[in-house]
Amino acid sequence: MIIEVTARHFNVPDYIRDYAEQEVQKLKKFNDRITRCQVLLSHEHNQHTAELNLSFPGQRFHSKVSTENLTKSIDTAMTKMEHHLRKYMGKLQKHY
């Protein structure tokens, strides 16, 4: 899986970059065919936004969260992404 961590309007500290990459690695347990995950971090007016764009063959998922804390934004976006993946994997299992 290719993981890209990008920041808008600020430079990402290494510990935040490592934290985001570590959290994204946890998504492999849902589907091992994940090919790419983009983590877009931005900061505007005391709001930190974390956006996750996840793709694997034939499917794309997106989650976006804004909070006052960057790590909290990453955690909440990850929770939303896990929910999307659980729902999708449940639908796949029902059809097969």
Where are these regions (language model features)?
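N-terminal, polar/charged subdomain of small-to-medium soluble alpha/beta proteins
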Residues: 1-96
